[in-house]
Amino acid sequence: MEKSDLLLLRRFSAKIKDTFVNPQIWAFGSRVHGTAVPESDLDICVVLDNFNSRDRALVSEIAWEAGFDAGVIISTIVFTREEFENGPPSASRLVQAIRLEGIAA
C-alpha cells in the first residue's frame, strides 16, 4: 500500500473512531494490493456494533470529506459486527478476502 493511501486510511479511521464506538476498519482492494491505477478508489470496510441509515450516511460523508482532501474516492462497505462475524456475509468471498488481505486501521 502506498504511503499516501496509508495516511488517508489513518485519517479516515481517526474520524470514524471519533464518531462511533469500537469500530473495526480495514482497507482492501487494488490500493492494498498495489495494483491500483490513479483513478482507483480506496475500498474500506467499516464494522460497527449496530448502525442505521443515518450512521451509514455519516460513514459515507466522512469518506467523502477525507477522500476529497486527498483527491481519492473512498468507497465504503458497512456491516454490523454480527453480520461480519456470524451472518451470511461472513461466508462471502468479500469478507473472507477482507479478513485475509485487508489492512486494519
Question: Which residues fall in each region the model found?
Answer:
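Catalytic core of pol beta-like nucleotidyltransferases
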Residues: 1-24, 32-34, 38, 48-105
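Short beta-strand->loop micro-motif that forms the acidic, two-metal-ion catalytic signature
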Residues: 42-46
